[in-house]
Amino acid sequence: IQVESTTSKGTGSGVVLRSDGYILTNNHVVAEEATSGTITVSFNGVGEVDTRADVVGLDPETDLAVIKVRGKHVLTPASLGSSGGLVVGDPVVAIGSPLGLAGTVTSGIISALNRTVRVPSETATADPTPLFNAIQTDAAINPGNSGGALVDAAGRVIGINSAIASLGATVDTQSGSIGVGFAIPIDEARSIAEQLIRTGKATHPALGVSAVTVGADGVGARGAQLKEVQPGSAAAKAGLRPGDIITKVGSKPVDSVEGLIVELRRYAVGDSVTVTYLRAKATRTARLVLQDKASA
């Protein structure tokens, strides 16, 4: 994927979702060109030509985007797997266009799961985007790989390559691979992509609170302590108050704010969920209906 605007240009990668031209990539690859730039897609294969594409939807919250090629094309969709059963040590392959070198394949393993990392923003002034629940891999990922596929040994896409950690780099500048790359799990990416194709935007379940991580130093209970509960929010309607410490969402333990976000993302807006929390050292539960973060 080649992107160009009046102020910048760059390259990225993508994953074909549907034969009629829908392609999944990263928000930070195409966001700046969504309104005033151009997006050109090049396909690897005999007889394929470069074609222009348009943005279907952007989701900065998860750093995902969907574009659609113009005209009539019959594309071969990628085979999407599941990220739910991944295990550290599983072999993986990263596919993309690092440094503009299309069709590059690198191999490695899953080094870790459930990482929280930050990726470069689409503009110099925007804050970096946090990725929650990311897959860490030592398969070489470099600038230009963003939006490309991380596949398992059977060739099924299990992640969308999105970020790297590099020596001498900050969240806004990246150097080369040192074997620490990160991908968005395909289960999350698939859900967001379906929403973007259907409505052009994505929703994100939320409680309507601000919180901080407590107990990480071994002192006191571990969890996400509420600092603010917005009036009329899902949390407020369920009786939650500032000072409450959320320790579970459903049956899953929560030991940090990041963990709370990860667990909430397993649900959809409108779902009913049970939250376990501590108030004055007493364990309580509350049933609430998740709201869209945009309205929180």
Task: Go through the PLM ranges and name each one.
Residues 4, 19-20, 26-61, 72-74:
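Catalytic-histidine neighborhood of serine endopeptidases
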Residues 54-56, 73-102, 184, 194-198, ...:
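Active-site substrate-binding loop(s) of clan PA
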